[in-house]
Design a protein with these regions (language model features):
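C-terminal alpha-helical "lid/dimerization" subdomain adjacent to the S-adenosyl-L-methionine
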Residues: 61-119
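A short acidic, Gly/Pro-enriched loop at the edge of an enzyme's catalytic core
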Residues: 17-29
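Core SAM-dependent methyltransferase catalytic element
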Residues: 119-140
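A short SAM/SAH-binding and catalytic strip from SAM-dependent methyltransferases
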Residues: 27-42
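A short glycine-rich, Lys/Arg-flanked "PGG" loop and its adjoining helix->strand segment in the class I
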Residues: 42-54
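Short alpha-helix adjacent to the SAM-binding motif of class I
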Residues: 1-6
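Conserved SAM-binding strand-loop segment of SAM-dependent methyltransferases
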Residues: 7-19
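Helix-to-beta-strand junctions that scaffold the AdoMet/dcAdoMet cofactor pocket
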Residues: 8, 38-39, 52-53
């Protein structure tokens, strides 16, 4: 209804699907603060790659984390809170699912890059950051 009100109803649709069951081809596929909670992030990234249009983009928004755990704890004021929440919520959730990789909310850019490279992406970059989030772009 809101898409119609905004004048975008002719080019917008909504569907309920999980990260490995949606159909179609997309210019942009987004994951907002969610990939680290998923048991099979490599498989999910691979599924996204298979559903991207030519020159399509995956936009990944994840909690801000530095790659080195010790530096993350000293230089990231949110790290202690996010490690605590991740240990209690995110990681157990991921471990309970198929594959159970358990990335957690403080995976960091290098680990996320590795996930997307394993899924067949060849370009991965930090598009932006805030004190709370990394905004990452992956392309084939």
């Amino acid at each position: 209804l809101r898409a119609d009100e905004a004048g975008a109803g002719d080019r917008t649709s909504f569907a309920v699907a999980d990260a490995k069951s949606y159909e179609g081809t997309y210019d942009v596929i987004c994951f907002f603060d969610s990939l680290h909670d998923m048991g099979d992030p490599v498989g999910i990234a691979r599924y996204a790659r298979e559903h991207l249009a030519d020159d399509g983009t995956v936009l990944l928004v994840e909690p801000f984390a530095l790659d080195d755990r010790a530096t993350n704890m000293t230089d990231n004021p949110m790290a202690a809170l996010l490690y605590t929440a991740s240990s209690s919520i995110c990681t157990p959730n991921s471990l309970s699912q198929e594959v159970g990789l358990g990335l957690g909310a403080q995976a960091g850019e290098a680990r996320l890059r590795d996930v997307f490279e394993q899924a067949g992406f060849t370009r991965f970059r930090r598009a932006a950051e805030t004190p709370l989030n990394l905004i990452l772009e992956a392309k084939v």
